[in-house]
Amino acid sequence: MTSYPRPDFERNPLRWETLNGQWDFLFDDADTGLAENWQRTSLPEKVSVTTSNTREGASAESDSVVQKIVGDTQALIQNNVFSASSQTTNSKTKIKVPFVFQSPASGINDRGVHEVLWYERAISDLRTAQEKEQGHRLVLRFGAVDYEATIWLNGEYIGGHRGGHVPFEIDATDAVNAAGQSSAHRLTIRVYDSAYDLTQPRGKQYWGAKPESIFYTPSGGIWQSVWLEVVPSARIADSSSGTVIKSNDIHGGQLRSTIVTKGRRVGKSYNVELEASFAGVPVAKSDKKALPRETDTVAVDLNVRLSEEQRSKLPQSILQDAPLDNDTCWRDGVALWSPEHPQLYDLVIRLYDSSDKVIDEVKTTTGMRSIDWTKGDGLWRLNDKPYFQALCLDQGYWPDTFMTPPTPESLKTDIELAKKMGLNGCRKHQKVEDPLFYYWADKLGYLVWGEMANAYQFSQEYVERFNAEWTEAVKLVINHPSVVTWTPVNESWGYGSLKDNVDQRNHIRQLYYLTKSLDNTRSINDNCGWEHVITDLTTFHDYSDGPELEKTCASLDLITGQKAGRDMFVPAIPGVEEGAKHKPGAPVMNTEFGGVNIAPAKKEDGEENRDWGYTTATNPDDLVKRIDRLVRGTIEGGHCCAFVYTQLADIEQEVNGLYTFDREEKLDSTKVKALITDAIQTFYNRVNKA
């Protein structure tokens, strides 16, 4: 992983160094590292394990959580609990970052319970003498560390972060400067990641000894890229710090941005400039706008409509793929973004000092596209036109690396594999993916529903944790045109008492309005699948086989009826609140269905029950026929304007993917693409007749 991790927000000039690779690593199962000041003395070669943090047995509460999710018809593995470790010492070893210790790719491949982890390595100051003189900063950047990270440099605390699925950065400059002329600096990281805390957002990471049903091997510690970067002291901030580029005004052609800066010194004056080009043709450049005295934020608007002269300069390759008279590609000189024509504007943001010198420059992209779900006719629109979202459930796991993509290209490959099957997007399920995924979704034309890793028990601690991390997740990907819907919660996970618990309902309402306050341009799916509290979309999950699903999807009453024993909308609580109902005309979407595996061969070890799916096909041809009937049943019922097929690829024991775990075809992709394309056409035929 030697390519720059954030091509969606790249400085010019770019000065960085990857910290991926070999680190010293030590399990601290007795949690003695802080008391013994490992951050000051360096990691010991060995440490005694005087007490075990592995809890034998399982709580009835955690078992009931799992059983409620998977349903009473699915038997759980008996005694699926971690055994207490007999190990009396842990030795310092090497780990290959960014792969987690549970994975083979890390070089450790340990599936036991280790809740406290220590990482250490030497780093050097990348800054040149001139950069130091100019006051440039040395920043440590972490893609994601699950779950709580504390960071020291040369034994001095420099920062920390809580939240396992979102990036953070630490300014290491002062600690490096304090070390004087030293050329090597000791970077130490302590990570705490509970194996059992069900109020901690964890997504599909299981708390049992063996992954089962829809749950998988956990990923503890550093699981995305780590790198050093040299940045100007005063600089342009990314979306995580508040820079937002709104690109939904396809009629006015206005790009509306809020540019945030960091590192502004008191009394200093700065100006911000935004420039746009398309396919190498300069389109527009804003006036230089002064940062107000009272804030580090400035609004910059830009008209990105191409004039006739600018359009005449476009390369023929662009015009052949996206003719100017095609209103799905262009709107009165505005280049439109869609899965079929993912046209992107190149943007450059510049920061000037008071002497009109460029002190920072960042390159990024955007796509002009609008989303509408409010017409009241049951349709979801992209760029003013009804659009059918044919999505897959994409959970982002790989055989030897788990939640970490094995290579940067793996993220691009998954998008290409989905499109090969005739799909135009995904629900990125129970995971905030590496930002490189969204970069490729923008470039390749792939719709994405933004989601977060849920927890499984409700508490005030959970509310505080989730609000903070969900906010960071939304801000991380808010500038990507490929992201079209927000889904904070899935299937009431963590909200087991919505039927009569006002506190749980109020938190889902809070998440809805919190998300709206961050971004009112995208649809919000409050609680995907059932028990909606307040939502823009009526989404339901139904893993019935073909005939039963056809019956359900032909009736709005059956669609909005109970699913998996849950009400589709929360009922009234007498004397307390009215509950919720389907809003007539709101888009209806089947956001989980399918999940069909192929009947496994008998195994001598008796583990055939580990090959798991919701329903079972006899062979690949039977699987294609089942998918055809499920897809047609969803669409031809006349109510659904989107589906999410479960799932893109097999994961461990859940072998109901369109591809195997290592991304090999399980069935003929040309047949699947043809049947999906044909079924979607029936949707457009019906809409066009209306």
Predicted regions: what is each one?
Residues 82, 93-126, 133-142, 146-154, ...:
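Active-site-adjacent substrate/metal-binding segments within catalytic domains
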Residues 9-10, 15, 26-30, 61, ...:
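Accessory beta-strand-rich segments of carbohydrate-active enzymes
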Residues 21, 25, 218-225, 229, ...:
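Structured, non-catalytic alpha/beta "coupling" segments that mediate domain-domain communication
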Residues 177-186, 260-375:
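Extended acidic/polar, glycine-enriched regions
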Residues 35-37, 151-154, 162-163, 198-202, ...:
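Short, solvent-exposed loop/turn and secondary-structure capping segments
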Residues 425-664, 671-676, 684-688:
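Substrate-binding/catalytic cleft of secreted carbohydrate-active enzymes
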Residues 245-261:
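Contiguous beta-strand segments within globular domains
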Residues 1-106, 190, 196-199, 204, ...:
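Accessory carbohydrate-binding/adhesion or oligomerization-edge regions at the termini
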